Amino acid sequence: MNALTVIPYAEFGIQSNFSFLRGASKPEELVVAAKLMGFSAIGLADRNTVAGVVRAWQQAKVEKLAYHPGCRLVFGDGTPDILAYPRNRAGWGHLCRMLTQANLRDETEKGATLLQRDDLLEWGDLMSLAVLPDLAAGAEDSLALLGQIKDRFGRALRLGVSPCYAGYDRFRIEQAAALAQVAGIPLMATNDVLYHTAERRPLQDVLTAIRLNTPVAEVGLELSANAERHLKPPLEMARLFRRHPQALAETLRFAEELTFSLSDLQYNYPDEPTESGLGPQAELERLAREGAARRYPSGVPHSVIKRIEEELALIERLNYARYFLTVYDIVKYARSQDILCQGRGSAANSIVCFCIGITEVGPDRIDTLFERFISEERNEPPDIDVDFEHEKRETVIQYIYEKYSSKRTALAAAVISYRGRSALREVSKAMGLSEDVRASLSGSIWGWSTSEVGEKEARAGGLDRSDPTSRHVMERANEIMGFPRHLSQHVGGFVITKDRLDEIVPIVKTAMDERKMVEWDKDDLDAVKILKVDVLALGMLTCLQRAFILLTDHYPKARDPYGQPYVLASLPPEDKRVYDMIGRADTLGVFQIESRAQMSMLPRLKPKDFYDLVIEVAIVRPGPIQGDMVHPYLRRRQGKEKPEYQKPELEAILSKTLGVPLFQEQAMKIAIVAGGFRPGEADELRRAMATFKRTGTIGNYRQRMIDGMVGKGYTKDFAERCFKQIEGFGEYGFPESHAASFALLVYASCWFKTFYPDVFCAAILNSQPMGFYQPAQLVRDARDHGVDIREVDVNCSAWDCTLEKVPFDPARILPRHADMRGVIETNHAVRLGFRQIKGLSKERMEDFAKRRGSGYETVRDVWLRSGLDVDEIERLAQADAFRSIGLDRRAALWEVRALGAKSAAEKLPLFDQPALRLRELEPETKLPKMPLGEHVIHDYRSLGLSLKAHPVAFLRERLDRAGVTPNANLPSQRDGRRVSVAGLVLVRQRPGKGNAIFLTLEDDKAVANVIFWERTFTRFRPIVMGARFVKVSGKLQSESGVIHIVAEKIEDLTPWLTVLLEKVSGAGAPGPQPMGYAKEVGSDRRSRPEIGNAPARQDLATLSEEAEQVMPKGRNFQ
């Protein structure tokens, strides 16, 4: 044979990186390599999973390579591994049922599969099987096994054998051949592949070490002895099996038996009885027409009627009516339970979705493109996303399970992959690096970064790239980036079927017993055309629903024109005062436009109407930024540049965005009108944008579009610039329909913040966790707007934050918000709820409030009547919640620690009475007053905020001496001046792959916005990423009301926070230990301190560390 000889051969049993922490190549890499090597066919077979088969199938279609999905069955009862490949659609159903049965056993842990031989015997029909026997075991046992399986499955069985490259392969293969001959089954060759190229062997070693949680140097015999488990060309396989050529030929016969393809999967939609008894299509038409009449009470416009008819006709041709009715049923149920919800995403392009109440933005408010939602050419199921209140979504989920049963519904999977930080952390651990080095390395990476780990990160983490171990760590970390770690449940994507779901895809357990998920993620499901309904959780919907309830309960005059309480759809639209507030970037806490990047854009864009909000939501995204769309749009909006339209057809598409394509729908329309794409092809372009990071296929359309535009008379330069902008959508381009759905919530949240900041503050605190900012900043912002915020108190607070009637004093509004005087209509204070105290449960505290009656009088009264344990009462004392009883934090803790049992129920009244009388005779203990700084520290520890003082206020004199400009004074500084600012780090944000990092710093009066350009960030990376309190020096930039400090230097001032404890070091008066310096909550505090003895003090270093750690760490966003 010469090098050009083509040897027919099919490789089966290939394991990809979806054999988690075993396979060292992606499915796509294996397919491409197999095509290049000239394989006749291949078959993926990951360990007890089919999670990677769709990705391999998609790549095989591109490469035009015969591909067969299968699974490597790994048993828990000693049965040797068996390769299982379905021969037809029914066989695929059997494989899925077998894996599901093993996945869902009671004794099976999440993420594991407990497969038994009986599962194979029950479900192994209609599959071709290859047993991989342990040739080191006795021949008698192997023959018994082969005989049992052959008796059950007959000619479907083979004996698979692979070389082990340990010096005795000839004997090994001869042994297998003899065993096959005696058993009467064919011998089949395989290389038991784990990676596509030998260069991946080092990565496979690292994966083994991670899986075994043992450094590579200590794994020993668990590592492969060589690098031979890679795809080998058929010619090489022929050489290895030259004494048994029939073993290679058998791979082809094995492949010929396999007629099943993933394209054979046919999804069947749920088919439930309709409300009216009509068929699905007729029912949908009825609902659409009735809904249109409600949406347009003055008469349905002819254009709307026409669009409804066109959409309904297409829905009928594609047989999608049952899908729409399924989503309608879920939304209808949610609203029957007073759960706020709305559809978003591409569904907002549909007038039918609007009419039947799935979406809330009408087509008159945006330029819709129905092909973005449904395409006859594409003939793929539509995707409707519906957001629900995040605290009530579980109610909707349980309804879905109850109605459709666990056999017909499950959540989609989410593939949790290695990103920069996790890749570095795991690989460095596998390579035996010390804990401090690992922490330094992972701390040098942006939290969710998927960018390659390079020289800058290595230097920041203290690695020397010239050191072989360090270089190995970086190389393996980059290789593992994007590899799957495990499957998790999707945030809310449900697959619902008419027939059994577990005959389409295996079902597995999740961390929640009542939930199950399939093995495929949303992209896999899209590829095989399986319907998914996204039941998503959105914190702002919870906030708005709570705000509407508070508004109705406390502001009876706040009503719509018909005298009804406001709801989302009836809020007064286009109120100038709301847009004025937005234009000033006074948007902390509101939906979507609260980030520093958004706030810096608002004064420049100055939204005036709803469509401006749609643009605002979409423009501060990596897509428009990467596509160089932001600055041209702003220049044109500000009149500094005229829009450019080469032809009227483009003006019709781009006029609303001043000639700049900001939305995916516009990109599709340009491809259709100017590039000559068909609608279905334009949607393929849109999909290429959406999956750019995973597939990188958007470049395939470049020449096609440029040639199409040039052919229609556009200049090549313009066509190239146009495609470059569209290519930017590969980094999270936003659909206009999606932005419009979000803009509705932006306006609603801003409306509440404008007129009722008390309502907004209480509602958003009661909806935590959500958003960019922590409760401390939300409370501070409300106080800046004149809202009275009151402390948590045992006699006044409920679980949630509540409103208390109080006259509103506009003078409380800070000068920088002076424009809100005369606008804000609030007349209530916000009482902080028990939910703000860390470590308390809702159920216990709601019961505590019910037992309160006319009020608790003493700590002992709380103990006797409330039902709380001493530990819970102590948490109340730590939060300084006994002020209405006349006790501050220290006094309340003294009283709590005098209680004699964990709970009052443990102490019989007969024995309790003497203690009561004895206590009455005890002398009053005079406790030293707790310093204010110490109070603030403990407020932050217990509540995450303090109403007593801001931590930076204690440092103001020292900061003034250091030349630091208070943040509130920045607006009076001239543009270009060098200044220094300081504050607690609230937020770090790095939009997309931009070369700027935004920091938000808070001092005692205001916030400052800081920009670090990449070079400066690299220089000071550890401080930027890790410090809690910093000083930044740089040049002030002021434009259109937007003020930034362009950083030149940053200093870590976190140790300065110890000033809050300065009085502690000199305290010597007798009394109990300051709160928080005793043992942690839950430890034994039953013994009462001796009166008059001074408490032991921890050293100042420990106290300093505590002062630093209790301050907020800052949140990182991309």
Swiss-Prot record:
Q: Which GO terms describe its biological process?
A: DNA repair; DNA replication
Region described as Disordered: 1071-1118
In the record, which residues are listed under signal peptide?
none
One Pfam family name is: HHH_6
This entry carries the following GO cellular component terms, namely: cytoplasm
Where is this protein found? Cytoplasm
Q: EC number(s) on record?
A: 2.7.7.7
The protein's predominant localisation is cytoplasm
Keywords annotated in UniProt:
Cytoplasm, DNA damage, DNA repair, DNA replication, DNA-directed DNA polymerase, Nucleotidyltransferase, Transferase
> Cytoplasm: present as a keyword of the record?
yes
Catalysed reaction, written as an equation: DNA(n) + a 2'-deoxyribonucleoside 5'-triphosphate = DNA(n+1) + diphosphate
Stored InterPro entries: DNA_pol3_alpha_NTPase_dom, DNA_pol3_finger, DnaE2, DnaE2/DnaE/PolC, DNAPol_HHH, NA-bd_OB_tRNA, PHP_dom, Pol/His_phosphatase_N
One annotated GO molecular function is:
nucleic acid binding
Membership in a protein family: Belongs to the DNA polymerase type-C family. DnaE2 subfamily.
The record's function comment reads:
DNA polymerase involved in damage-induced mutagenesis and translesion synthesis (TLS). It is not the major replicative DNA polymerase.
The protein in question is named: Error-prone DNA polymerase
Q: Which species expresses this protein natively? A: Mesorhizobium japonicum (strain LMG 29417 / CECT 9101 / MAFF 303099) (Mesorhizobium loti (strain MAFF 303099))
